[in-house]
């Protein structure tokens, strides 16, 4: 179980480990039994002393065989390939998944959700950290599809007249401009909401266009190779070298003609953690964003990474000296002022008191779900409203509140109208 929660500012998993340790340990034991796994290990940072105490107490009280593995405080400790190496010493090969080396990694909230599933409860509510420029940084549990604006209101609102919201963490999250907040809704994969000033460092970074990025690379890249030296995947022995990609980009060759270059194709191995552009690059360039753009171009061209056969991958010997401390990463990301906030407040929205929700039919990287209900159908919270497409990877979708269905004509979402305005009733998790 990945309890590192390495993104600065996010504290949802830490809250669950402190307050729901017994449920997590019971679920872990059952998962181990059901799957026949040899071990169940919870990896979390050694600095999480309160969380460690709660988990150790639950393990002792339940007589569990679950083990704890204490990590250093660095970013991205929670990257699944990084955490596999930290715990087991095994290197996941490039473009492979942890299962290829006999491991499965799930985060804390996922294990909590599996515990709900064991009890017959579908996934309809999401835990979130709401922090930054809000009156009361808070851990929320809200129905999937809750308006982002309501989540901010639950945290006491913001004093800012102009702001952005980061969906996720400051390193890997996506920016929601203020104008788009009223039309943004909680999804299954949303981990946190960070409210920041409109002129914050994160907002400025997100305003750089692809053309500007390329021009910056041409004029300012000094080929120091710090991006490659600090890259977590390169340090695991993977052949990605961001500085070489930036060098090719600065040559002026059209992107379409670069896609056959082996160095450019290695952009597919980027985990998009952001260490290269936010922490390593002394010139403020954007190797991660370039890699993300190239990955999309490679996908459009139908080019997939081909791992050479017979190659054994080993972590680089200098890896231990090149881990980026979490607090310094937060400072470089421009959110250092919020990093040490202790968030113990919790607020759970009662689904029976919730207002209208909007559930996207594309909740993850799989195929969009297919509605199993029609316009005007009444539904109860927990009822299935969309199914995974046949012969495709995806997920089912369940009503997070009770109400009447309204399906988007373009097939993007299902809205459930409860006939109520938003009302907040505090509950225990």
Say what each PLM segment does.
Residues 90-94, 98-99, 107, 308-350, ...:
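Extended boundary segments
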Residues 369-378, 382:
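Short histidine-centered loop motifs in beta-beta connectors
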Residues 380-394, 412-415:
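Short hydrophobic beta/alpha edge segments that flank linear recognition/processing sites
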């Amino acid at each position: 179980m990945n309890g590192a929660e390495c993104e600065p500012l996010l504290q949802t998993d830490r809250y669950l480990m402190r307050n729901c340790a017994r449920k997590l340990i019971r679920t872990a034991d059952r998962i181990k039994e059901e799957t026949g796994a040899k071990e169940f290990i919870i990896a979390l940072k050694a600095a999480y002393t309160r969380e460690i105490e709660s988990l150790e107490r639950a393990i002792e009280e339940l007589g569990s065989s679950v083990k704890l593995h204490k990590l250093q405080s660095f970013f991205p400790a929670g990257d699944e390939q990084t955490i596999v190496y930290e715990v087991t010493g095994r290197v996941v090969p490039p473009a492979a998944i942890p299962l290829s080396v006999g491991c499965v990694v799930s985060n804390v909230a996922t294990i909590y959700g599996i515990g709900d599933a064991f009890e017959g409860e579908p996934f309809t509510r999401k835990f979130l950290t709401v922090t930054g420029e809000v009156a009361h940084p808070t851990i929320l549990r809200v129905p999937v599809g809750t308006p982002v604006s309501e989540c901010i209101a639950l945290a006491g609102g913001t004093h800012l007249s102009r702001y952005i919201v980061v969906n996720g963490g400051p390193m890997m999250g996506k920016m929601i401009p203020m104008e788009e907040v009223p039309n943004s809704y909680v999804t299954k994969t949303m981990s946190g909401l960070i409210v920041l000033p409109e002129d914050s460092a994160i907002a400025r970074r997100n305003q750089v266009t692809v053309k500007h990025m390329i021009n910056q690379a041409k004029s300012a890249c000094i080929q120091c190779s710090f991006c490659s030296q600090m890259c977590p995947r390169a340090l695991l022995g993977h052949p990605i070298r961001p500085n070489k990609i930036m060098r090719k980009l600065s040559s002026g060759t059209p992107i379409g003609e670069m896609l056959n270059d082996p160095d450019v194709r290695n952009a597919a191995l980027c985990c998009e953690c952001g260490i290269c552009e936010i922490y390593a690059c002394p010139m403020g360039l954007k190797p991660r964003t370039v890699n993300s753009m190239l990955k999309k171009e490679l996908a459009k061209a139908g080019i997939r990474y081909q791992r050479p056969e017979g190659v054994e991958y080993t972590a680089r010997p200098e890896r231990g000296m090149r881990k980026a401390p979490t607090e310094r990463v937060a400072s470089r990301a421009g959110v250092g002022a919020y990093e040490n906030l202790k968030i113990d407040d919790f607020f759970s929205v009662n689904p029976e008191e919730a207002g209208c929700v909007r559930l996207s039919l594309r909740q993850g990287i799989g195929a969009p779900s297919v509605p199993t209900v029609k316009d005007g159908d009444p539904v109860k919270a927990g009822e299935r409203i969309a199914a995974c497409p046949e012969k495709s990877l995806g997920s089912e979708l369940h009503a997070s509140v009770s109400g009447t269905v309204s399906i988007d004509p373009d097939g993007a979402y299902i809205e459930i109208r409860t006939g109520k305005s938003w009302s907040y009733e505090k509950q225990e998790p």
